[in-house]
Amino acid sequence: MHTPGTPAPGHPDPPPLLLLTLLLLLAASGRAVPCVFCGLPKPTNITFLSINMKNVLHWNPPESLHGVEVTYTVQYFIYGQKKWLNASKCGSINRTYCDLSVETSDYEHQFYAKVKAIWEARCSEWAETERFYPFLETQVSPPEVALTTGEKSISIALTAPEKWKRNPQDHTVSMQQIYPNLKYNVSVYNTKSRRTWSQCVTNSTLVLSWLEPNTLYCVHVESLVPGPPRLPMPSQKQCISTLEVQTSAWKAKVIFWYVFLTSVIVFLFSAIGYLVYRYIHVGKEKHPANLVLIYRNEIGTRVFEPTETITLNFITFSMLDDTKISPKDMNLLDKSSDDISVNDPEHNEAWEPHWEEVEGQHLGCSSHLMDAVCGAEQRDGDTSLTQHGWLNSTIPTGETDTEPQYKVLSDFYGEGEIQLSCEPEEAARTEKISEPLVTSANLDPQLEDLHHLGQEHTVSEDGPEEETSITVVDWDPQTGRLCIPSLPIFGRDPENYGHYERDQLLEGGLLSRLYENQAPDKPEKENENCLTRFMEEWGLHVQMES
């Protein structure tokens, strides 16, 4: 390697005497005389400026020749060769640069170049460059930058620079192919916060996310080539602003569906939770239809009691003479009450209430009851008696109905009407027999026996046998039959009256509350009607409706 100002290898300076002889010969022949070295200053600061393999030689004019028209001649030398070569486009030029890209296109070789200044007939010495290695010394220009903005992001697309080509029609070669390890240093400047940050990338795309909306950002990029340090060449600064925050249509749809699905899920979970809670804590049991909650004020408690319709029994009082009833007939009367079986389905069917058939089959005449017993004080067509005290409810009689306090079924009690019938031809001492309504078209045979029994004693011409009078009280809860003994209203009470029947009834406990001891020692009042005495003797409360 030689230093600038020394002869190039293979070209030693000629001796002064030989040069003088050559000049004389050229002058004799009439040719142009070349410049003669006479101490003209040489160009300065001669260097290669290479960008993307475009190699240009630059220099400065001689120091003492500013403003003077000076021409320059350029030669180049390929490292490893033996002679200098003239640059085809850089002989006797007046500019201070020479493009040697064609001569130095092989970037894997090393080159030298030299420049000489010529003014009139004088010239300067050669000014040479240092060895130039394009592959290591060329500068890579910044890539092409394309920016795309979003609400909070900026997308940066980078395109690698191209290698210099002699003709535009030549094949394009990217600097990425020459330098596979080419990198890019991206710098972003926030104009609001006045902050800059850099990021080195190897790919051609960079997305900057989570930026501030509606903010101006400035971006510049420079190429980095691994190897010896090179002068950086940053790109031109490009600025772009992020978009304002806007609720786009697809975001609105996403929010809508999110809220909708969340609401549906919450509703389903709530419904399932409610059903589970109701299944666990809320009972589904229902009380039987025949039970109702009855509030009893006199006790202060509430109990369950069958809710069935109260049936009113028609009670017919027949005034019979004890003297006309024989013991045989009394036994038949007892037998008629005792032989009825509650388990007999035929019997139960025979006693189903049919009001239309029963109204005409009373044992007595209710319309003339008050004429015979009460002294014709009330002579209306129908006398209604209302009895209070059964199950703490009002029992309607006749055609007047009073709805009970609670709903009751019609198959628990039978509806009825208290009817009193007095036969004027019977004796003073009578027997009262209370019967329920006959609920079928054909009367029960046992009731027929009782009916015939009364007729027997009425039409009998022979006097009754003197037998001990027997009082019978019989009530069958299944059939509703109620047989009440005759009242001692005429002052003749048989011995041990009512004890036998009372003892039998008290054993079952059915009439324990209804039965009260009669008062045979009570003085008799002739003007007291039979209904009043019946109420006093039996402890009944009967309301007479006019």
Swiss-Prot record:
Q: Which UniProt keywords apply?
A: Disulfide bond, Glycoprotein, Membrane, Receptor, Repeat, Signal, Transmembrane, Transmembrane helix
Provide the membrane-side ranges marked Extracellular in the record: 33-253
Instruction: Spell out where the chain crosses the membrane.
Output: 254-274
Signal peptide residues are 1-32
Indicate whether Oxidoreductase appears among the record's keywords.
no
Q: Has UniProt tagged this entry with the keyword Isomerase?
A: no
Glycosylation site positions: 45, 86, 94, 185, 203
Any single biological process term in GO: positive regulation of intrinsic apoptotic signaling pathway
**Known function:** The IL20RA/IL20RB dimer is a receptor for IL19, IL20 and IL24. The IL20RA/IL10RB dimer is a receptor for IL26.
User: In its UniProt entry, what is this protein called?
Assistant: Interleukin-20 receptor subunit alpha
